Amino acid sequence: MAKEDVIEVEGKVIEPLPNAMFRVELANGHRVLAHVSGKIRMNFIRILPGDRVTVELSPYDLNRGRIVYRYK
């Protein structure tokens, strides 16, 4: 999938799930299932409930996403 096709939105981590998955509530109120991107995983960045994150959504499946950035 090309980088131009993704939708980037901000959200807040609601709960951690097994296998590095997280339930994220987006700014518009929707809740999505998101996994951690490879760069965040490689740099050992911890994501905890309550963290503000940027999530990339595919236009084909708006219920799943990838966490690409955690705000400080």
Swiss-Prot record:
Family assignment from sequence similarity: Belongs to the IF-1 family.
Main function: One of the essential components for the initiation of protein synthesis. Stabilizes the binding of IF-2 and IF-3 on the 30S subunit to which N-formylmethionyl-tRNA(fMet) subsequently binds. Helps modulate mRNA selection, yielding the 30S pre-initiation complex (PIC). Upon addition of the 50S ribosomal subunit IF-1, IF-2 and IF-3 are released leaving the mature 70S translation initiation complex.
Cellular component annotations (GO), alphabetically ordered: cytosol
Protein name: Translation initiation factor IF-1
Family matches, as PROSITE patterns: S1_IF1_TYPE
Compartment(s): Cytoplasm
Every S1-like domain range: 1-72
InterPro entries registered for this protein in UniProt: NA-bd_OB-fold, RNA-binding_domain_S1_IF1, S1_domain, TIF_IF1
Main location per the UniProt record: cytoplasm
Protein source organism: Moorella thermoacetica (strain ATCC 39073 / JCM 9320)
Keywords noted in UniProt: Cytoplasm, Initiation factor, Protein biosynthesis, RNA-binding, rRNA-binding
The keyword Cytoplasm appears for this protein: yes
Pfam families referenced in this protein's UniProt entry, alphabetically: eIF-1a
Subunit structure, as described in the record: Component of the 30S ribosomal translation pre-initiation complex which assembles on the 30S ribosome in the order IF-2 and IF-3, IF-1 and N-formylmethionyl-tRNA(fMet); mRNA recruitment can occur at any time during PIC assembly.
GO molecular function, one term: ribosome binding
